Regions:
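Core hydrophobic alpha-helical membrane-spanning segments
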Residues: 15-17
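Feature captures the catalytic cores and cofactor-binding loops of soluble hydro-lyases/lyases
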Residues: 311
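Domain-level detector for secreted/extracellular nuclease and nuclease-toxin modules, and
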Residues: 2-13, 22-296, 303, 314, ...
Length: 322
């Protein structure tokens, strides 16, 4: 009960920050972005619900409005916010097989050629005191040379304090990979929480978020489950459970509608509560070894692509392709 009260108080504090007008006074900020307001009718989509061998295509993609800059790369899709020079969200499916890294980090940060308005650059971050923090982590994209290269696009970066990026944020990324291993595949959406009065860095005025979020959906039968996180852009020694919230809570502070392609009743059930005991909290991604021999599913989607999931079923097909 004490934990729930603390969590409720923490969420209320975030909401006050968002709707009262930013987390720092003007006296402490020499550079600010103009006030940002999300239109009440801004959530729309060009993705349709598309059934393919019982799979929901593009399940990881949040609602977006017509005119939003949506960029698709090999391993992830993002919504780019030109005002703040970073993504509103980065979304991807992460399978157990993809967590087994085949390619090392390039550490070569690149301007994203697919962002029509131009992304941030290395000069924006130089001597700023902030890390070029990955939204979709490089360790999630090590399953091909292309995905690893694309994970270093500046459209996938956000200014993060070193203690946060190399500490609790990295720990959460590792935990998410553990969940992908345990559940065969999960859907991940991650990004910054934009508020009024954010400081900026560089000539392109890259906004410095005060908070970041992740939402995760396990859509593997029999135990469907979802969870969200909101973390301050600061170092922390608190356990990750302290920052766990419902997906609905993340939607309230970001204005983003996650996993909207689910049936309404199912979406409501998965997003309204957070069940921390439903998830394991010890990262095992580095030493993960399957108890069975898993292979890539031999199922083919309607688009003609081979299913990315792994399976230990004797027929070589995952549950969705039985």
């Amino acid at each position: 009960m004490i934990h729930l009260l603390q969590l409720s108080t923490w969420i209320i504090r975030i909401l006050l920050i968002l709707f009262i007008g930013g987390s720092c006074s003007e006296n402490n900020k020499t550079e600010t972005k103009s006030d940002y307001k999300l239109p009440s009718d801004s959530l729309a989509t060009t993705f349709e619900k598309e059934e393919s061998d019982s799979l929901i295509q593009h399940l990881e993609i949040p609602f977006f409005q017509e005119g939003d800059q949506i960029v698709s790369h090999t391993g992830y899709t993002l919504s780019y916010n030109e005002t703040f020079e970073q993504a509103n969200w980065v979304a991807y499916e992460l399978t157990a097989q993809e967590t087994q890294k085949a390619f090392e980090r390039t550490n070569k940060f690149l301007v994203d050629p697919a962002v029509s308005t131009g992304s941030a650059t290395d000069a924006d971050y130089k001597k700023s005191g902030y890390d070029r923090g990955h939204l979709a982590p490089a360790a999630d994209m090590g399953w091909s040379s292309t995905t690893m290269i694309e994970s270093f696009y500046f459209s996938n970066m956000s200014p993060q304090l070193p203690g946060f990026n190399r500490g609790i944020w990295k720990n959460l990324e590792s935990l998410v990979r553990s969940w992908a291993n345990e559940n065969e595949s999960i859907y991940v959406v991650t990004g910054p929480v934009f508020t009024n009065g954010m400081s900026t860095i560089g000539a392109n005025q890259v906004a410095i978020p005060n908070y970041y979020y992740k939402v995760i959906l396990d859509y593997q039968e029999p135990s469907l489950k979802g969870i969200g996180f909101i973390l301050p852009n600061a170092s922390s020694s608190l356990p990750l459970q302290h920052f766990a919230v419902s997906i609905d809570s993340v939607e309230k502070v970001t204005g983003i509608d996650f996993y909207h392609l689910l049936e309404d009743e199912q979406e409501t059930l998965l997003e309204k509560t957070v069940c921390t005991p439903c998830w394991s909290w010890k990262s095992t991604s580095k030493s993960y070894k399957s108890n069975t021999t898993s292979v890539q599913c031999s199922g083919i989607t309607k688009k003609g692509a081979r299913c990315r999931r792994t399976t230990s079923n004797a027929n070589g097909r995952c549950q969705q392709h039985q």
